[in-house]
């Protein structure tokens, strides 16, 4: 052991402390950097005593606990007088500095602490610690701490690197000290004091000691710990991680909780605040460090909640606190980008877990979303929006409100993990499959927190054999199948699951052992052992949050995947809005009507919505039998519910709000049930369901035309019942809810039946048949080379493109082939947009009326892309005066006015999300203006009138192409039909109507020819 008096005259060879095994290289590094022997003694990070460097670990383990510590009076913690004399910088250890340095800020010190400060300056200062920097306050706190012994790592090499870097900056530090005044009363900042003490404390514990496990952190910062260097007053601080620092910085300073949380790092900790060369700054930090360290160690040792920041006894004025700036915040975190130390693995493994924060200090209260990842921010915005609405909160009982409160009381990592799991499908998940490194490297404590709070279930509650089997992978199932000697242990996963479920239902042969578990219990036990630890979010809390999300996004159609995976689409919308990447039109939210009468009404609606989602998912996957069983179950539920007294009030709701009732959802399910039965060729059952749907007029009246049309087809084509078919057609044509294409379809079927010889005896039934005349339009035919292909996919054609000197062959659709034909015919401009072309012009010309104020209940939340009554008759009736006036203006407007109106809306609203407007439909505003100039007022006015009067039934069937000549303003509206394609009834009606309005329309038929034929004729 080295002599404690002074360093040896001649340094003996010693073992390198570096990780590297190249002793020569390590020795050269130390000699070149220090040019003398390393210090014989180091300061103990606990008691600040000078200890021989090689006895530091033994001192901490055996001797340090028995030493006396300097007791600090908490009342003395405060600011120091500014007239403290300067201290020679040579007495301060030279350490690492960052390449970029900023002048230190002026520090105003209070006059009440000058004497004590001067006394402390005279104390001995070690090369790495000031002797008066007390880390533990009393003996009891020390005894409660557990100090682990870890390797010193590459301490010598690190110190040498710091020495070289710091030596280069010493002159600049002295210049900073000479240029900064000794007193300034205008720049005292609270973050300077708080962060100076806290960061300095962590600096001394983490950097200058090899005992890097003596670091305490906020429980909400269970992130990956990657050390980084920060400079403050010629002291080096290795932060736990930049990610953890950023998390604590943002969470600890959220407006709603800044008074209740201890700040580890302030956003105003910038490098221009860190380079301090005067002893005044050091004394301030020494004085302020004591109280903060005391609190942090008390939190760890006693396992208690964090106390409010007011107990820190550091008082500053409001003006000083307000001196923080966002610019400083940005510069701080852009400059702190240091590389991790070589032995940071030890640090990652040895940092202890600290206590969870209370709601007041968890930084996760309602609306406080700054610093959270995108998914948690979106989730908190949804919660805040619904919780702030009194009508919505009446739909939750006290227990459910308590669940939301518990969520806010979770730590930040707990909230993150729960939202991640909430967005996944509701099923059991193996612990080994849970990997969210951005939340925590070790999710075990987070899962334990969620389990204790009642948000997660563990495998101890997994008792359903089918769920366990679904949890197993295919190899695991095969292994289990071999254990139970199944007939086909190497079969597909679903086959093995079915085989196990069948085996579990068999009765045991050994009937004498009544206490023996059945075969199902044995399979369950073996399967659970094979699956290992697993978790699933609890259904109760998940249902509460699902209903909250449902209320938030009630006006959006809930997609199948969203219903199964926690509304990912809605959360993504919230995120994009918060990021400024999505903006909705400006309108006034006006909620007058209560859609849900009580909590039970909302629960029934949510259950029906999820049932519809499950059925739609089964249909999309082709599982028709499964979809049939689900639909039958839903039908039974609806039959028990449809006469409930609470449903009678649904009839009084306007149609655009009635679609958010449980009866509407079950009616949609029964309509899907008809499709399922028809796919399974069960036409008798389908007819009965259609007749049942048509017997009521409360729910889904906009679907009545489709139901009548399908009923007539089933009776006529599949069941060959002519008389019921004719009666069905007659009743359907008399129904005012049967519109446009469906009405024309029923009429044409009636005409075919009337002319059929087999229906002569039913001619008397056609006497009341109303006449419908649809004018035919021009038809042209072109040819194209069809690309050979298999299956029923869309036709693909081969077309010659490019210049005549350099032709190229391309594959194209039938519409692109038609565009090429019209381009050669003199139409230099063309758009293939179908209905979106006209709906975009409709939205641009009537934007202000579509989103006008004064109509109750059509705008109910902040993320609507259209008014709720857009697809109902009430849209036109409630805006009739404004619409009639605008349509007349459009009809009579000259070309310049049309162009100006389109330009005005384009410039004011471009990019905003509106369901009617596709901003990418036109290549530019100029193209949109050119098109309205060609179409003219009468055509535009007529199209807009039809869309405004019945958007639900008129949005489909518009022509595929709009082509025009930019010079002559000559245009055509073209419907393109490929091989084996024909016009739909809606397309026939639109073509005839556009022709009446004065537009030149035609149908372009594309005939396929052989590959060796010409591309176009």
Curated annotation (Swiss-Prot):
A zinc finger (UBZ4-type) spans 41-69. Mn(2+) 2 binds at residues 834, 960. Residues 895-1007 form the VRR-NUC domain. Mn(2+) 1 binds at residues 960, 975-976. Changing residue 47 to A: Abolishes interaction with monoubiquitinated FANCD2. A motif (KEN box) lies at residues 212-214. Ubiquitinated and degraded during mitotic exit by the APC/C-Cdh1 complex. One of its GO terms (molecular function) is 5'-flap endonuclease activity. Its cofactor is Mn(2+); Mg(2+). Belongs to the FAN1 family. It catalyses: Hydrolytically removes 5'-nucleotides successively from the 3'-hydroxy termini of 3'-hydroxy-terminated oligonucleotides. It holds the Pfam family Fan1_SAP. Residues 1-10 have a biased composition (Basic and acidic residues). It comes from the Eukaryota. The UBZ4-type zinc finger specifically binds monoubiquitinated FANCD2. It comes from Homo sapiens (Human). It is found in: Nucleus. Its main location: nucleus. Residues 11-23 have a biased composition (Basic residues). Binds 2 magnesium or manganese ions per subunit. This is Fanconi-associated nuclease 1. Changing residue 952 to A: Strongly reduced affinity for sites that have a 5'-terminal phosphate anchor at a flap of 1 nucleotide. Its EC number is 3.1.21.-, 3.1.4.1. Interacts with FANCD2 (when monoubiquitinated). Interacts with FANCI, MLH1, MLH3 and PMS2. PROSITE patterns: ZF_UBZ4. Zn(2+) binds at residues 44, 47, 59, 64. It is linked to Interstitial nephritis, karyomegalic: A rare kidney disease characterized by chronic tubulointerstitial nephritis associated with massively enlarged tubular epithelial cell nuclei. The clinical picture is associated with recurrent upper respiratory tract infections in addition to chronic kidney disease beginning in the third decade of life. Schizophrenia and autism. Schizophrenia is a severe psychiatric disorder characterized by positive, negative, and cognitive symptoms, and it is associated with increased mortality and severely reduced fecundity. Autim is a complex multifactorial, pervasive developmental disorder characterized by impairments in reciprocal social interaction and communication, restricted and stereotyped patterns of interests and activities, and the presence of developmental abnormalities by 3 years of age. Most individuals with autism also manifest moderate intellectual disability.
């Amino acid at each position: 052991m080295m002599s404690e008096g002074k360093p040896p005259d001649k340094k003996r060879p010693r073992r390198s402390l570096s990780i590297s095994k190249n002793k020569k290289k390590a020795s050269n590094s130390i000699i070149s950097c220090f040019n003398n022997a390393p210090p014989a003694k180091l300061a103990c990070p606990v008691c600040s005593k000078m200890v021989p460097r090689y006895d530091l670990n033994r001192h901490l383990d055996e001797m340090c606990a028995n030493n006396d510590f300097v007791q600090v009076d908490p009342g003395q913690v405060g600011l120091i007088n500014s007239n403290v004399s300067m201290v020679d910088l040579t007495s301060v250890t030279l350490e690492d500095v960052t390449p970029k340095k900023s002048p230190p800020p002026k520090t105003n010190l209070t006059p009440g602490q000058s004497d004590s400060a001067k006394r402390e300056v005279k104390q001995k200062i070690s090369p790495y610690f000031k002797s008066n920097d007390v880390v533990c306050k009393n003996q009891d706190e020390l005894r409660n701490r557990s100090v682990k012994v870890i390797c010193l790592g590459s301490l010598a090499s690190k110190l040498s690197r710091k020495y070289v870097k710091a030596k280069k900056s010493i002159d600049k530090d002295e210049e900073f000290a000479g240029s900064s005044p000794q007193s300034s009363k205008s720049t005292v900042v609270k973050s300077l004091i708080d962060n100076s003490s806290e960061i300095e404390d962590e600096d001394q514990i983490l950097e200058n000691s090899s005992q890097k496990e003596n670091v305490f952190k906020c429980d909400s910062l269970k992130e990956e710990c990657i050390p980084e260097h920060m400079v403050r007053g010629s002291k080096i601080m290795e932060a736990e991680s930049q990610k953890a620092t950023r998390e604590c910085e943002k969470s600890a300073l959220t407006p709603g909780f800044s008074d209740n949380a201890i700040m580890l790092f302030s956003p105003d900790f910038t490098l221009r605040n860190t380079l301090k060369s005067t002893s005044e700054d050091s004394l301030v930090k020494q004085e302020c460090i004591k109280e903060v360290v005391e609190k942090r160690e008390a939190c760890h040792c006693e396992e208690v909640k964090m106390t409010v920041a007011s107990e820190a006894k550091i008082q500053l004025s409001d003006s000083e606190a307000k001196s923080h700036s966002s610019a400083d915040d940005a510069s701080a975190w852009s400059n702190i980008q240091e590389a991790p130390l070589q032995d940071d693995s030890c640090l990652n493994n040895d940092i202890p877990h600290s206590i969870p924060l209370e709601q007041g200090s968890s930084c996760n209260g309602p609306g406080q979303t700054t610093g959270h990842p995108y998914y948690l921010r979106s989730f908190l915005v949804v919660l805040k929006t619904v919780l702030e609405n009194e009508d919505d909160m009446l739909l939750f009982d006290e227990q459910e409100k308590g669940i939301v409160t518990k969520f806010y009381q979770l730590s930040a990592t707990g909230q993150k993990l729960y939202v991640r799991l909430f967005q996944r499908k509701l099923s059991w998940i193996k612990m080994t499959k849970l990997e969210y490194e951005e939340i925590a490297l070790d999710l075990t404590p987070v899962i334990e927190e969620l389990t204790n709070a009642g948000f997660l279930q563990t495998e101890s509650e997994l008792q359903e054999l089918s769920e366990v089997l679904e949890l197993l992978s295919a190899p695991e199932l095969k292994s289990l199948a071999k254990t139970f000697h199944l007939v086909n242990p190497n079969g597909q996963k679903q086959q093995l699951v079915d085989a196990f479920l069948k085996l579990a239902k068999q009765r045991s042969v050994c009937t004498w052992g009544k206490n023996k578990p059945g075969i199902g219990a044995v399979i369950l036990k073996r399967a659970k052992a094979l699956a290992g630890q697993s978790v699933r979010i609890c259904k109760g809390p998940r249902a509460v949050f699902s209903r909250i999300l449902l209320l938030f996004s009630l006006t959006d159609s809930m997609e199948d995947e969203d219903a199964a995976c926690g509304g990912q689409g809605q959360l993504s919308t919230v995120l994009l809005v918060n990021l400024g990447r999505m903006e909705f039109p400006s309108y006034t939210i006006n909620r007058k009507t209560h859609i849900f009468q009580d909590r039970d009404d909302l629960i029934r609606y949510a259950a029906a919505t999820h049932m519809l989602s499950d059925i739609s998912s089964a249909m999309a996957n082709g599982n028709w039998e499964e979809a049939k069983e689900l639909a039958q179950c839903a039908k039974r539920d609806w039959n028990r519910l449809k006469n409930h007294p609470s449903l009678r009030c649904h009839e009084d709701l306007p149609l655009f709000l009635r679609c958010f009732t449980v009866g509407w959802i079950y009616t949609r399910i029964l309509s899907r049930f008809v499709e399922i039965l028809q796919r399974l060729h069960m036409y008798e059952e389908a007819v009965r369901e259609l007749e049942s749907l048509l017997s009521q007029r409360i729910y889904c009246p906009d679907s009545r035309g489709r139901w009548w049309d399908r009923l007539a087809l089933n009776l006529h084509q599949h069941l060959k019942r002519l008389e019921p078919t004719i009666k069905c057609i007659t009743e359907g044509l008399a129904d005012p809810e049967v519109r446009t294409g469906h009405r024309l379809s029923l009429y044409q079927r009636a005409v075919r039946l009337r002319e059929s010889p087999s229906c002569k005896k039913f001619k008397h039934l056609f006497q009341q048949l109303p006449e419908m005349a649809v004018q035919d339009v021009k038809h042209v035919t072109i040819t194209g080379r069809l690309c050979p292909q298999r299956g029923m996919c869309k036709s693909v054609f081969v077309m010659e493109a490019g210049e005549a000197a350099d032709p190229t062959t391309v594959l194209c659709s039938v519409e692109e082939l038609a565009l090429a034909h019209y381009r050669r015919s003199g139409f230099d401009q063309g758009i293939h947009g179908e209905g979106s072309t006209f709906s975009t012009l409709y939205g641009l010309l009537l934007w202000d009326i579509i989103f006008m104020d004064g109509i109750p209940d059509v705008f109910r939340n902040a993320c609507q892309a259209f008014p709720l009554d857009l697809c109902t008759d009430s849209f036109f009736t409630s805006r009739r005066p404004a619409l009639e006036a605008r349509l007349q203006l459009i009809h009579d407007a000259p070309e310049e006015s049309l162009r100006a109106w389109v330009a005005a809306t384009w410039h004011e609203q471009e990019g905003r999300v509106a369901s009617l407007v596709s901003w990418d439909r036109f290549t530019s505003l100029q193209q949109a203006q050119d098109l309205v100039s060609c179409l003219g007022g009468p055509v535009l006015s007529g199209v807009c009138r039809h869309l405004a009067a019945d958007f639900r039934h008129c949005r489909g069937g518009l022509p595929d192409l709009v082509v025009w000549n930019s010079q002559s303003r000559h245009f055509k509206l073209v419907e393109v039909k490929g091989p084996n394609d024909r016009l739909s009834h809606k397309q026939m009606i639109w073509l005839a109507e556009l022709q009446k309005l004065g537009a030149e329309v035609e149908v372009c038929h594309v005939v396929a020819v052989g590959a060796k034929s010409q591309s176009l004729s």
